[in-house]
């Protein structure tokens, strides 16, 4: 159609204008000039494809990945060779290493027989040690024997447990995420306060206390400018943007830079992103009147796993990993028992959010349990604080399934209610239009917060975006737009009279040139 031709010519012109190299531009122009000017009726398609095949996104990404892999391999080879060459001339370090290994194996990890001089000689051969906070006995108890101690998952660590390792280091680097699960204290707040008052150290509780503290909080308090001095590791590569997009919006305040490209994701049979399955279940107490279980919801989870295993565990998808996360231990145990009886428990990890802290799976199922019968306090506990929900939904790399009572969960006033409404939004877009869902994904990556299917004075629009007082309506035009141009123009004028800008985006542009669409949206919203 004429509109498709116009779109194609405009897209080619935009792409042509971005070519920086004049010689290359002239070469491509030899084939594209008539097309760009609009004079060519019969396009030389084969010649055009040949000229630009080196610039296809897949080819460019493949070349970049190949260069990255080569650089990584070369870097490791150089470092390895330099290390081996240096070690081959250091006889004292080799002898010390042999002696330490002998003592380590004989004494089951204890190093009490090793003197500081031998240990320091050994460190020249093995300068990097990886250990847990519970295993410092494998390292010589001497001050400052390590130049740097790196503490990972610092919000899970108490200062008390880390003191033996901190004692051994000159400097420490603390890595953590305060939006993840906190450490579980071994003393109550009241007991700790009583001890602090008894020994007159009340003023140190905020900095060095155990019950309401962790290594990350203490480290922040030690920085000269507190939170201002934190170095943010904000680039996120793990999760599909529709999954991490919720947490970025509602928990991380848009600080994350989403780097996983939905156009080049690992395609899996059941689809990528977020899915919702509604189950009107009921809650009851677990064994010995502890915890909570929602059996109809758990049964639906097991059915879903059976379907997923049938679709995603054969051929090229046989390596996909799966997990089920739930807030309640009784629900975890019920699901595990049922999956075992069905012969499906193998290669499916089931647990609470604490089980999955620091872990990830290709496919995750979130079973919130909240439904009729649960107490108000138990339902509130699921979402307050928000860390439990955040960990539960961000373990998924490719696909996240919410299986639960959507109405009951949506009625919650905190993060659970917001998440269910987000799931509903994505599910509605998935059922309506692939291009709308794709554009929503790209807008989420950009950090936008689009309202979807908004009704403005009886006129329903696809998306509404706001920025510094500007209001932009974005409409994704499919084939039906060609038959309703006059009506659409009338709608646009009506919306403009109400103070909205209107941007119409061809569905084909969303499929083929999403970056250009996002650029147009940013321009309309007057982003710098």
Task: Annotate the PLM regions.
Residues 455-493, 497, 506-512, 523-525:
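Short beta-strand-loop-alpha-helix junction that forms the active-site gateway
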Residues 307-394, 405-411, 419:
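Conserved helicase C-terminal RecA-like lobe
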Residues 188-231, 340, 373-454:
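Helicase C-terminal subdomain and adjacent C-terminal extension
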Residues 109-252:
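ASCE P-loop NTPase helicase motor core
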Residues 145-146, 168-171, 224-230, 274, ...:
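Short glycine-/polar-rich loops that comprise or flank the Walker A/P-loop
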Residues 2-145:
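Conserved helicase NTPase catalytic core signature
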Residues 135-136, 155, 178-182, 188-190, ...:
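Conserved nucleotide-binding/hydrolysis micro-motifs of P-loop NTPases
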Residues 254-337:
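Conserved helicase/translocase motor-coupling segment
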